[in-house]
Amino acid sequence: RESGNHPFGALLAGPDGEVLLRSGNTHKDDKGTGHAEMNVARAAAKAYAPEFLAECTLVTSVEPCCMCSGGTYWAGIGRVVYGMTEKRLAELTGDNPENLTMDMPCERIFDAGQRKVAVVGPVPELEDEIARAHEGFW
């Protein structure tokens, strides 16, 4: 909160589970496009071969939005794990203009593509903890 950024985080795990990249939200500098998942997807696409990324996992606090799902798909990342649904996020953010959500599950975005992206989430054991980071923020 002190950084001026929104409470989201993402990381890229390699096939062996090693954390390769991580990022928070960069709203302060990048406004609406500085989502943690997009930051990781852009860095991953620059740093790694598509064949390697197909075996990697994007782990994110909240279900990727449409933009982040597209970025993940185009970067070639093969798997997504998220903690809390975007629908639950919308309940926490309301109509805050800094985080207007779209009711579009990431699976629908990935299912429209020609390449399979596996999705795991939400993670019920983490949802309340993730939600606490948003309480009072919006």
What residues fall within each predicted segment?
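Short HxH-centered metal-ligating active-site micro-motif
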Residues: 33-71
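Short loop/turn motifs at secondary-structure junctions
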Residues: 6, 52-54, 76
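Short beta-strand scaffold segments in enzyme catalytic cores
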Residues: 8-17
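Residue-level recognition of the N-termini of beta-strands and the immediately preceding loop/turn
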Residues: 8, 54-56, 117
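Short beta->alpha transition motifs characteristic of CBS
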Residues: 20-27
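A structural motif shared across PLP-dependent enzymes of the aminotransferase-like
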Residues: 14, 31-37, 122
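Zinc-dependent deaminase
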Residues: 1-3, 71-138
